[in-house]
């Protein structure tokens, strides 16, 4: 793999890609996204922030396919045909680190740690590490994070760049395989709808810590499948959590 650095001064960004054989960016090394292209604000792009968007009619359709390490510090990944950022079949763990920026308005998940396109035959020995230190995942048609093959950590580093997973239509974080995990600390999960719940623990394990906020979602805030439990580890005074089991709802 190779290292890629995208900054506002070094690239024209990636926008409106059609009929490409793969995707917007296929990363097998290290991809540091500090920026892209600063577009003039318009009705189509009401922002002057860096953009990777409108990756359509490609083989896979996401803005970024990651098989290495993707570090996102700023910018927007939006409007892509199949997921904003997606891990694929790999023979080692891959890593997605969000320090800032926005993943929004994509068809499918904001981040898909699913080993697509063949999750049923992919080895369960390798997972995508998704570390949320800052930034926003919002308004995607699927989950904010589909963590079937994911190990998610939410640990907001600064109130100046908060972690927010909000207004996604397929829930916020979905855990569906025995090896999937989430350790959710300081950050906010709100305004999500659809799925079994904003944070849905169907399989795997879930730990809540710090000033985690899971509230204000449509339907369940925190869903636990029958027999599943959640670990509470040093919750802060600012923590806010609502829980739903298969038979009982707790506001």
Residue ranges of each PLM-predicted region?
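Tight coil/turn sites that cap or link beta-strands
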Residues: 1, 28, 93, 150, ...
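Beta-strand-rich solenoid/repeat architectures in extracellular/passenger domains
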Residues: 1-21, 36-61, 73-85, 94-95, ...
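Structural motif
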Residues: 148, 202, 225-226, 245-247
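A motif-centric signal for short, conserved binding hotspots located
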Residues: 222
